[in-house]
């Protein structure tokens, strides 16, 4: 995230607000109206502010019928480019985190910065085979515009379907997470409840409530 002092984006400002919250505080977030498609050169133009011009539309990967969904638990996640490389290392202790928080469960969040669709699929399948998707309550995945159309023989959604096809828990994609602003303020280890309505794969009336407990 580019934290420019003149930036008025509420998602940016939420980061600083959350730093002042006391234990057991709650805050609620909702999907953005629009996101930024362009990639400014901050080295050449360091005072560039966000330009949110493309309509945001969260999607549900595995539910297309009309229904309400909810996922709740402790947040755990990060950038897939890094998480995938930490698999089976002591620095990705998800199994221990699951055991410690078994009563609340886990909401996993992921996004990718520079991976191709095929690499996204490989990383996700590696995590799946390692049991990372076992006994979790849901997944929320950030958008990555540069992946669209990057490989004409294998697109981004195919990669996600390869890993999450058949999963019973909700899988929300194209969310406000990652390297394409704006970004939700997700805090590892915090309790989170995500509710939404789904119809024809589109997500509406979304709410992300985080509790610092």
Predicted regions and their residues:
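Conserved anion/nucleotide-ligand pocket segment
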Residues: 1-81
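Generic secondary-structure signature for well-ordered alpha-helical cores
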Residues: 17-29, 85-92, 129, 165, ...
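Predominant activation on well-ordered alpha-helical scaffold segments within soluble catalytic domains
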Residues: 17, 80-88, 121-124, 157, ...
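Short acidic (Asp/Glu) and glycine-rich catalytic loops that position anionic groups and cofactors
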Residues: 57-63, 103-104, 137-143
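Glycine-rich phosphate/diphosphate-binding loops and the adjacent beta-loop-alpha structural elements
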Residues: 65-70, 107-114, 140-147
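Oxyanion-binding "anion nests"
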Residues: 74-120
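Intrinsically disordered, low-complexity coil segments
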Residues: 26, 63-70, 95-102, 197-202
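C-terminal active-site/capping subdomain that shapes the small-molecule cofactor and substrate pocket
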Residues: 116-213
């Amino acid at each position: 995230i580019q934290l420019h002092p003149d930036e008025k984006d509420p998602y940016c400002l939420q980061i600083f607000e959350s730093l002042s919250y006391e234990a057991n505080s709650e805050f609620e977030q909702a999907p953005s109206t629009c996101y930024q498609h362009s990639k400014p050169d901050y080295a050449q133009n360091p005072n560039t502010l966000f330009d949110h011009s493309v309509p945001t539309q969260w999607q549900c990967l595995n539910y297309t019928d009309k229904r309400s969904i909810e996922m709740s638990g402790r947040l755990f996640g990060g950038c897939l480019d890094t998480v995938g490389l930490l698999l089976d290392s002591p620095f990705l202790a998800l199994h221990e985190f699951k055991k410690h928080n078994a009563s609340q469960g886990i909401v996993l969040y992921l996004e990718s910065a520079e991976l191709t669709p095929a690499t996204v699929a490989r990383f996700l399948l590696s995590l799946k085979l390692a049991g990372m998707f076992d006994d979790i309550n849901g997944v929320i995945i950030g958008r990555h515009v540069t992946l669209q159309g990057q490989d004409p023989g294998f697109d981004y959604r195919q990669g996600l379907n390869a890993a999450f096809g058949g999963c019973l828990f909700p899988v929300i994609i194209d969310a406000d997470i990652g390297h394409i602003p704006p970004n939700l303020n997700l805090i590892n280890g915090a309790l989170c409840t995500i509710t939404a309505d789904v119809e024809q794969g589109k997500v509406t009336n979304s709410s992300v409530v985080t509790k610092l407990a």
